[in-house]
Amino acid sequence: MNKVLGNKKAISLFVVPALIVYTIIVMVPVIWSLYYSFFSGSPGLQWEFAGFDNYARLFRDKNFLNALTVNCKYVLVVTVGQVGMGLLLSLMFKFWLRRCKTIVRTLVFFPVVLPTVAVGQLFAKIYEIQPNYGLLNSLLDSLGFTNLVQPWIGQSSTALWALCVMDIWVAMGFYSVIFYGALL
């Protein structure tokens, strides 16, 4: 192993092809897109230099600003939720759990390895759009909170938060394992 890591030819043999593929697939399109963003026109026809006019028009667009606001909320809530829940779970593993520690850690980490389609189907059933049909609405109804029964993913006021809960649940196990490893 040390022989390979000390050999610059061996390192180049592994790194250079990957860099070439990455440059062709990722970097070239990013640079082209950035270059084309300073022009107006149709591809193959007439192109005019627009400077920063395209960006000025973008930041005046209400739809773009709304999408940017929603994305910022999502990133903030999901990041804080995943890291915060992961930290709390890792502290629970270290200082509170005495029995069944391995089983609980496995169950908490399980959503990380679930396929995205399975998680989507699971939460589609939990947040079922028809009231009183999904798991969450049935639970709320049986506990007497009938005024909270609603289509969770079907309305703009609750859809973002429902998706945030799903993403936090999926990734908090990963962060809990990372933090738990740091606590050991």
Predicted feature residues:
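A structural signal for multi-pass alpha-helical bundles of membrane permease subunits
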Residues: K3-L184
